[in-house]
Amino acid sequence: MKFLFDLFPVILFFAAFKVAGIYVATTVAMVATVAQIAWVWFKHRKVDAMQWLSLLIIVVFGGATLIFHNDTFIKWKPTVLYWMFGVVLLGSAVLLRKNLIRAMMEQQVSLPEPMWGRLNLVWSLFFLAMGGLNLYVAYHFDTDVWVNFKLFGSMGLMVVFILVQSVWLARHMQERPAGANPQDDR
């Protein structure tokens, strides 16, 4: 359910684009993201840093798209988000010696230490590649193709990536004794 809730602005962007074009769709995405953040705030009194970041990026790039009447800005939005994720994952591992993928997943998954490093690297590279692919589609195809790619192509690639990763993880997962603390795996 959270996955669909997170996709809410993207789905509305897609629908608005099909009906009224890129500028209306951009406005709809901005309003939907603000509404989404407001809903999360009123319901939980807390908003994740990633949601704030997403709001900031849609407001900046969506705003630039509307102010300058140039859809190039909104087309850069996914790339900026993907590249930020990739750089943060890679940078935190290299510079801070902190594996963010492990921090997010270790409660659910028990892996040998070297696998956590590989998993973090693979996610980082995936996000960097997705950012590049988004730009390729944005600059080599028309806006209609880019919008379809944004919803179906990037989501499809994400699902395939997660499925392949799940198969890979299943081969390396360790049994954790009942009641064991994930911190003990370190």
From Swiss-Prot:
Subcellular location: Cell inner membrane
A single Gene Ontology CC term: plasma membrane
Membrane topology: Multi-pass membrane protein
InterPro entries registered for this protein in UniProt: YciB (IPR006008)
Entry's transmembrane regions: 3-23, 24-44, 49-69, 76-96, 121-141, 149-169
UniProt keyword terms in alphabetical order: Cell inner membrane, Cell membrane, Membrane, Transmembrane, Transmembrane helix
Annotated family: Belongs to the YciB family.
Main function: Plays a role in cell envelope biogenesis, maintenance of cell envelope integrity and membrane homeostasis.
Name the UniProt record assigns to this protein: Inner membrane-spanning protein YciB
Organism: Ralstonia nicotianae (strain ATCC BAA-1114 / GMI1000)
Recorded name of the encoding gene: yciB
